[in-house]
Structures are given as C-alpha cells and as structure tokens.
Amino acid sequence: MTNANMARSSILVALLLAVATGVVAQEKVHTVEFYSPAVERTMKYNIVLPEAYEASDERYPVLYLLHGLTSNYTAWSRQGAAFYAGLAGDLIVVMPDGGNSWYVNWAENEKGQRNDWEDHIVKDVVGHVDGNYRTIARREGRAITGLSMGGYGGLTLGLRNPDLFVSIGSTSGALSYARRNAAEARGEVAPRARRERTAEEQAGLEARQARINPNIGIESFSSQAERTPAGRAFATAEGADAYDPFKLVLQVPHEDLPHIYLDSGTEDRLIGDARAFAQVLFENDVPFDFMQMPGGHNGTYWTQSLGHIVSIQYEVMRRALGERPVRRSRRP
C-alpha cells in the first residue's frame, strides 16, 4: 500500500470510528424548519456552514445532498457531512427531506395531498437557502448529489434543471426507477410480482409504517406511512419518460450539461444502473467521472463515497467560479 493510500485509509478509519461513537461535530449541523408551498407542509433540512461563516461577509457555494428511500434529512449527517464539509472549508452543505417521494412532482394525488417534490427541492429548498444564507446564488455555485433514491433524484433534478446546478451526481443510485415505470406502463415488462402477506405480516407492516421516528420531528410527516405519498408518481409512460435520466441526458444540449459524477460499490445490486448510465454517457461523448469501489448498499460505503463527492463537486464549483470563492475576511 502506498503512503497516500495508507493516509486515506487512516482518515476513513478515524471517521468511521467517530461516526460510530457519535463524536463527529454535530454542533456544526443546524436544523432549519420552513414552509414549503410545493408540498403544502412545514418541512426541515439540515445545513452545515463553514467555520468562518459568522466572521465573514463572503458568499459560499452549496452542495445539496439527497437521502434515500425510507430515510430522511438526518441521514447524511450520520455519514460525516460536517467532517467532509470542514475539510473543504469554504462550502455550505444542505441536506433536505424528500420523504419517500422519489423527488418527482406526482401526477396524481390522494388524501388531499400536494406532492410536488421536485419543486420542493429546486424551488422551495434552494429558494429558502439562498434567501437566508450567504450563498453564491447562481449555477456555478450549486451542486447536487444523492444516495440510492437520492442518487436518482440528484441526476434527474439536475438534468431537468441544468440552469441551477453546475455539478450533479449519484452514489448507489436507483437510476432505473422511471425507466422501469415507463416499461411497465407500455407493457414491455411485467409489473413486479409482490408476495402475498399473511394477515399477521400485514398488521406488523402497518404497525411499523405507522411508528413515529422522533429524530425526524416533522408534524404529520415522521412515520413511513405519513412520508409515503398517496397517489401515483407517473400516470403515463410519457410522464415517466420525463423523469428518466437515461433520456434526459440526451435531451440537454452538450454545452448546457452539468458535470456528472457517478459511483457505486462493487457489491451493490444497483451497480448495474450506474454502469448502464455510464455506458450511455460514454457512447454519446458526455464527459463524466465514474468510480467503482469495494462496498455494498450501506452506510459504511456512503461514508467513504461522501469524501469523494465533496472533494470532486467542490472542485468543479471552485473552477466554475474561476477562483477560490472565499477569502476568509473577518469583520472588524
């Protein structure tokens, strides 16, 4: 092992131990509550500010991190977001909540809900962050990435809104979500078979889904049942196509495409999605960064992945801005 690899391994081991023992600087993670018109409810996000933020008048680039299915806005904090943001120094990290929505504007809603989750992120969260913090509120100062469902969201929202983000990414992304839905709607594949549950199994499932997670703390949005939209994400195959990153990346003019980052663990069942998307990019001469590392679909892998995400996407923003964005000036 080279000295560089030994150093990286030592940093990762130290971070994993810190995360496991809860000593990562959680005091740097702030929870913000705000009203989101797109989903007509009060929501929360976590934010990490640069150490010099209070003593500076400068504006900072922002990295948005999207969580996975059944998770929430606290997930990335547990993977070391504050630690890695601190290594970058001049970076704001925002971790919004998207419930179990797949980050799309739902075509059909039930129970009186409004589920415009794409708009929640790209309009309400980004708007609230830009309106309340000293951000670099333009494309060059924003990047977005997510894990699993959030990896799908990071690429899809970035490709549907290429004017908002200079870099987009996915780690362990479930990138075939919309493509599978479109294929089922067209009758090209059979709907996924679901095993029949016994009455006891169904009762147990409903009890688990109704259980409130006190760590979320969002009124009427803290159990899996509450966090799962009622309705249909896509009413037609065409509706699913509109949220398919495999199609979207071919519709954005090359000169308007954001930087694209992909990674996946080699033991992750979703690595095929990442490889298939990378193949589409390669065949169409779209520049991208792709990384495969040992690991599965789990927190240990994502803690390691986050270090690469922050380093690469921060550097893309820094270069797009033309200089190191913060001079660390202090107020008198």
Q: Predicted regions span which residues?
A:
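N-terminal signal peptide c-region/cleavage motif recognized by signal peptidases
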Residues: 20-21
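Bacterial N-terminal signal peptides that target proteins for export
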Residues: 1-12
